């Protein structure tokens, strides 16, 4: 059974054979599920500030727990 990839920007799982794989000069491998994620990553956008990313949703839950 093939292993699903996880987007390095938004955290979404996607099928093998789709998306893009980017290898940095230091050897770190980044997977992107869409061109939107790839462009946002290279523009330097913070995924914790975008509502549609998993990082935002996790940070939101942590903020809610601290308030209680």
Curated annotation (Swiss-Prot):
Cofactor binding annotation: Binds 1 zinc ion per subunit.
Zn finger (C4-type) location: 7-37
Keywords on record: Metal-binding, Ribonucleoprotein, Ribosomal protein, RNA-binding, rRNA-binding, Zinc, Zinc-finger
Annotated CDD domains: Ribosomal_L24e_L24 (cd00472)
Cofactor annotation: Zn(2+)
Gene Ontology CC entries for this record: ribonucleoprotein complex; ribosome
Xref: Gene3D superfamilies: Ribosomal protein L24e
GO BP annotations, alphabetical order: translation
Domain of life: Archaea
Amino-acid positions noted as binding Zn(2+) in the UniProt annotation, renumbered to this chain: 7, 10, 33, 37
Pfam families in UniProt: Ribosomal_L24e (PF01246)
Transmembrane segments: none
GO molecular function terms noted in the UniProt entry: rRNA binding; structural constituent of ribosome; zinc ion binding
Described purpose of this protein according to its UniProt entry: Binds to the 23S rRNA.
Oligomer and partners: Part of the 50S ribosomal subunit. Forms a cluster with proteins L3 and L14.
PANTHER family assigned to the protein according to its UniProt record, in alphabetical order: 60S RIBOSOMAL PROTEIN L24 (PTHR10792), RIBOSOMAL PROTEIN L24 (PTHR10792:SF1)
Family: Belongs to the eukaryotic ribosomal protein eL24 family.
Protein name: Large ribosomal subunit protein eL24
Species assigned in the record: Thermococcus onnurineus (strain NA1)
